[in-house]
Amino acid sequence: MKQYLELLNDVLVHGIQKPDRTGTGTRSVFGWQMRFDLSQGFPLVTTKKLHLRSIIHELLWFLRGETNIAYLKKHQVHIWDEWADATGELGPVYGKQWRRWAGADGHEIDQIRWLLEEIKRNPDSRRLVISAWNVADLPQMALVPCHALFQFYVANGKLSCQLYQRSADIFLGVPFNIASYALLTHMLAQVTGLAVGDFVHTLGDAHLYANHVEQASVQLERVPRPQPVLMLNPAVTDLFDFTYDDIVIEGYDPYPAIKAPVAV
């Protein structure tokens, strides 16, 4: 995961100090790209321990098309708690847009199911794109999409993914985002009969919050350890049938976690 540490170091050293929506203050750079060969190990940050249960359950929650945190709370995942209202609702966030995008004529579009069918039917398409950035729905969202758009690419029997992330909290958020979209790529590859290719992560505003600087410095002192391996239950042939128990990370040997406050 040297790619991630290079980003962290660059923003720490060269980032421009800017105010932000949360009032915390950031150092940021604009435009950064990382590439991970998914056949060479699962891109899970090892220089601090990540909460795997949160990463996996959040992705499964997105794929369920849900926008209420009840499912997450049931599985002891609290990463969305600060943004939910008293009933646990977040408005039309990722799950709604992925699975139930409101079409102009009123019918709902299941982008993920369409993507599955299109990869099988037309793998060379340049339109294998999913968007969570629904301009009409943004005012109703508790938090507008940070990871806004992603595209798939099939070549030589391998499935690759590129994510565009408009806003990237590089200490807390980006390690989760890398793992989440790498996991999604593996899952999609399995159910479409493909091998995995690359995960390409393109960042817009890549920022380090002012109250994460000390933690980032600690992390940069640590030498990355070998990447773990993702094992998916080979019996699963439908993307929507995956459960938490079907997803296993083997050989994850991280350094201790580094706590940092979330900017809300």
Curated annotation (Swiss-Prot):
Annotated localization: Cytoplasm
Record-listed dUMP binding positions: R21, R126, R127, R166, S167, A168, D169, N177, H207, L208, Y209
UniProt: (6R)-5,10-methylene-5,6,7,8-tetrahydrofolate binding residues: H51, D169, A263
Record-listed E.C. numbers: 2.1.1.45
GO MF annotations in UniProt: thymidylate synthase activity
Active site, per annotation: C146 (nucleophile)
Pfam (any one): Thymidylat_synt
Top-level EC class as recorded in UniProt: transferase
Keywords, comma-separated and alphabetical: Cytoplasm, Methyltransferase, Nucleotide biosynthesis, Transferase
Assigned GO CC terms: cytosol
Reactions mediated catalytically: dUMP + (6R)-5,10-methylene-5,6,7,8-tetrahydrofolate = 7,8-dihydrofolate + dTMP
Pathway linked to the protein: Pyrimidine metabolism; dTTP biosynthesis
Keyword DNA repair: no
Biological process (GO), any one: methylation
PANTHER family, A to Z: THYMIDYLATE SYNTHASE, THYMIDYLATE SYNTHASE 1
Known function: Catalyzes the reductive methylation of 2'-deoxyuridine-5'-monophosphate (dUMP) to 2'-deoxythymidine-5'-monophosphate (dTMP) while utilizing 5,10-methylenetetrahydrofolate (mTHF) as the methyl donor and reductant in the reaction, yielding dihydrofolate (DHF) as a by-product. This enzymatic reaction provides an intracellular de novo source of dTMP, an essential precursor for DNA biosynthesis.
Family listed: Belongs to the thymidylate synthase family. Bacterial-type ThyA subfamily.
HAMAP family in the cross-refs: Thymidy_synth_bact
Assembly and oligomerization: Homodimer.
Name under which the protein is recorded: Thymidylate synthase
Organism of derivation: Xylella fastidiosa (strain 9a5c)
